[in-house]
């Protein structure tokens, strides 16, 4: 009986391994991406070279993680990856890519609190940077239609009615 008790104690001690499960490497990669994204947010807006490099890094890392591990991540994490792809593309001056990723983020997560922001950023880039006025108008109108009560929709209505497509001279005359 004594041997059985000793055997049970030894068995219990060895079976109670207090080792923690290792965190999968893709979660560490996601945390690394969060840190780089925070660097971009905190960066000096006049340091264009640094912003460009951070943008390239964020875009590449987020897309790499999304393509390889999107099934392992929850919706919030996948949305973050698409958001990073979009903002990284914009910071890296890859504006057509940014427009596409903002649209993809909104389409994949239309109920997200950030969905109207994605559409607004898409419209802003189309309008002010790519100078694609037709698609910019459509993007603003889509924002207004899908999220009519959001403050960005209200701003977009005012913008389309009063400023969109007008020259600087026409805008100055409106302000007088």
Task: Name every feature range the model reports, one short phrase each.
Residues 92, 129-130:
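Structural motif corresponding to the intra-repeat A-B loop/turn of tetratricopeptide repeats
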Residues 137-138, 142-176:
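Terminal, low-structured helical/coil segments at or just beyond the last alpha-helical repeat
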Residues 12-15:
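C-terminal motif of bacterial Sec signal peptides marking the signal peptidase cleavage site
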């Amino acid at each position: 009986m004594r041997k059985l008790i000793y055997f049970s104690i030894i068995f219990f001690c060895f079976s109670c391994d207090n080792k923690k499960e290792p965190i999968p490497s893709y979660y560490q990669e996601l945390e690394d991406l969060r840190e780089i994204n925070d660097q971009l947010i905190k960066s000096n807006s006049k340091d264009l070279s640094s912003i460009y490099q951070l943008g390239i890094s964020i875009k590449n890392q987020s897309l790499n993680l999304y393509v390889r591990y999107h099934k392992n991540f929850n919706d919030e994490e996948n949305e973050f990856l698409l958001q990073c792809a979009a903002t990284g593309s914009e910071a890296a001056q890859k504006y057509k890519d940014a427009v596409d990723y903002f649209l993809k983020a909104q389409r994949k997560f239309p109920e997200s609190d950030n969905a109207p922001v994605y559409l607004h950023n898409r419209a802003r880039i189309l309008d002010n940077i790519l100078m694609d006025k037709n698609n910019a108008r459509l993007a603003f109108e889509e924002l207004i239609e899908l999220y009519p009560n959001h403050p960005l929709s209200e701003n977009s209505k005012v913008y389309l009615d009063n400023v969109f497509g007008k020259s600087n001279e026409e805008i100055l005359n409106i302000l007088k």
